[in-house]
Amino acid sequence: MAVPLARVRPVVVRSPEPAPKGITVLRRLRRSELPVGAVALARYLIGKTLVRELPKGRIMGRIVETEAYLPNDAACHAFNGMTPRNRSLFLERGRVYVYFIYGNYFMLNVSAEKEGVGAAVLFRALEPLEGIKMMKRGRRHVAEKDLARGPGRLAAALRVTRRFDGLDFCAPGPLWLGSAVRPAGRIGRSVR
C-alpha cells in the first residue's frame, strides 16, 4: 500500500544517554549485521561508533542522532530516481553517500536498502570519543560539545568530502562503522 506523500516525513532517532567512559571500538561492522531499511538502520546505528582513519591518528565518535530517508519521501535524494550524483544511494546497504548543500556543508549518509532501491540514513550527531584535537583543527571557535552536533559539523569534524562518496563503511578504508556499547536507556523516535 502506498503511503500518501503528505504523511511521509523523515524519521529522526536520538540517543538520550551519554556513552559510558572508556568505550573502545571492538570491531568493524559486517554488512550482514546491518538491517535492511532506513528506519531500522537509523535505529540500529544509535550507539555504534563512526571511525575516521587519518595519517596522524584516528577520529572516533558515538552515533547519537540519525535521520531516515525512505524511497517514497520527497525529501530523499532517491525520490526521482537514480542519477550520477545520487548513484551511491542505490548501492547495497552500508555504502557512503555524501552530498554538498548550501555551498558550504557536506552531508554524510549511509545507504540503507538492497541494491537498486534508494534510501539512506543521515548521520546527524556524534558524541566525540577520540581525536578531539583533530576534530578541532581549523575550527577552534567551535565548542567541544558542538564539534559533531548537526550533520554539517559532523562531516567537518570527520573531514568528510565528496571524495568519500561510494566508499564501503564495512570494508577497510578511511571511514568505517564499528561496534560499541548500545545505550542502556530508551531510544527516541520522532518525525521532523
Feature roles, as predicted:
Residues A2-R192:
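Conserved, well-structured core segments that form or line functional sites
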